[in-house]
A protein has these predicted regions:
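Patatin-like phospholipase
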Residues: 1-38, 46-169
Length: 169
């Protein structure tokens, strides 16, 4: 039987779709030997490699903005005093100028669900793409290229959106 590689894209909203694709591939018994992704695609790829479909499905069923980033309540609260669109834009702008959105909640979520040892022992390879701000170019890595104990750091770096606080490795 043929073996296949799976590539997941970045873009937060695509994440739940990608889990649906994974489910369909499992139901069709299509053998996956490698998964590559960037941003949310790298995060989902890690879940595929460790084989935890139910955990991934649960995350995507229950996830909220607060599970990903620490956002001022006024930005999300439709009833807040910052009711105008421009007030909200200005709050976001100030946050970005102040160093970016804090994604500690996402890091905490990954630490609770990602099992680096399981991923490293899996016969399925994991590839991810992140970006070097020093060299100003993409960095492509497979799990064997990532120093032990730093997989979550690299996943966070891959998921780093320009409005987020940068993840330095």
């Amino acid at each position: 039987m043929e073996e296949f590689g799976l590539v997941f894209a970045g873009g937060g909203a695509k994440g739940s779709y990608e889990i649906g694709v994974w489910k369909a591939l499992m139901e069709l018994k299509i053998p996956i030997i490698a998964v590559a992704g960037t941003s949310v695609g790298a995060l989902n790829g890690a879940m595929v490699v460790q084989g935890d479909f139910e955990a991934a499905k649960s995350i995507w069923t229950d996830i909220s903005v607060q599970d990903v980033m620490d956002v001022q309540k006024d930005i999300l609260d439709k009833e807040s005093s910052a009711s105008s669109f421009m007030d909200r834009i200005n709050m976001i702008k100030e946050t970005i100028i102040g160093g970016g959105l804090d994604v500690t909640p996402l890091s905490n979520l990954l630490h609770s669900v990602i099992d680096e040892e399981k991923i490293r022992k899996s016969p399925i390879d994991l590839g991810l793409v992140t970006f070097s701000l020093t060299d100003f170019k993409p960095v492509r890595l497979f799990k064997d290229d990532i120093p032990e104990g730093q997989l979550i750091d690299y996943l966070m770096a891959s998921a780093c959106f320009p409005a987020f606080k940068p993840k330095e490795i």
